[in-house]
């Protein structure tokens, strides 16, 4: 049964929006949920099982943290002078592109959600956002970094994260300055890793580095030894691996078994997750990982406070440190909330325009969308695992440790 606002509620929203009323964070009195004018429903198909289940868990927890905060502490979403409860409807997409498309259709047509929060992974976001576009429903996402998502002329997809093509930019610039000259790239043949690899080739050339080889591999592989053997024989300064968490483990274990020891290893997704260090132990030391967010970063907002304060809140709720996937998921929902509040409406056209006009800084970083829906304002950071600790080494203005290069020296 749908809980979306009824016609009378929509009239209240429209009238309040016309009056230009707005709300700010920090209300001294949090209304009882029953005192709000209605409920705004958000739909989220996330990976609770399958190959993306680790990242999917982080995604769901990020959404849940926002949902609990906005209802229990913030006092509901402020639309004009009224408050509205937030409800997120979840389904397990099983890390499957066909299933996420079907579930997105279900969320729109059966559950009658008002807005959509994106799934984890670019390939799933591609399909889900296509269904959203067909129905004219806004989707804000924080876990699909492939530029291809935003190159289809869609009006209703907005991504808060730094695009995949820029994942390695900061790290390659720093490594080039440290003397690295040659690069090899391995990537999974899927939307996000392809975007990372194409960007890495572009930025390596920009920084005067030679790409010795680029090789792709199919989704779901369990052995990358052939690629790593070829790369070992090329003796590059830098190895770049584009994939997801399990791929990151394969790269490190494969390199170790084959005696492949480049001066630096940049690997997406895995290294910034404490579970990566826990699984690999000392083998993780020295690995560099692009990161969308870390608790040491200096961004803050009036909602969750500083990045550190957000991290502490997450730890209290879930008993572990937040990954950047969790943080960007919370930021996704927060961004949609801000757009609703700034527009004074839940009507699609008004909220879409508020997203296009948005220029804010959150605990996760700056949010400013270009005409395609990409966040054009947010830089990418990078970490390095040093003595078993995840240390922020770039960009330099927010780093808490110095880059170690080359490894073994």
Regions found by a protein language model. Name each.
Residues 1-41, 404, 408-409:
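Short, low-complexity disordered leader/linker segments with a strong preference
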Residues 74-81, 298-301, 367-368, 387:
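Short, solvent-exposed loop/beta-turn-alpha elements that line the ligand-binding surface or hinge
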Residues 122-129, 236-258, 332:
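Hydrophobic alpha-helical
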Residues 255-330, 390, 396-408:
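Extracellular/periplasmic periplasmic-binding protein-like sensory domains
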Residues 29-35, 54-61, 73-154, 160, ...:
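Beta-alpha junction/loop-to-helix N-cap segments that form part of ligand/metal-binding clefts
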Residues 98, 110-215, 264-289:
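Extracytoplasmic ligand/sensor domains, especially the bilobed periplasmic-binding protein
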Residues 30-39, 43-66, 91-97, 120-123, ...:
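Extracytoplasmic "Venus flytrap"
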Residues 313-326, 335-393:
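Segments of small-molecule ligand-sensing domains
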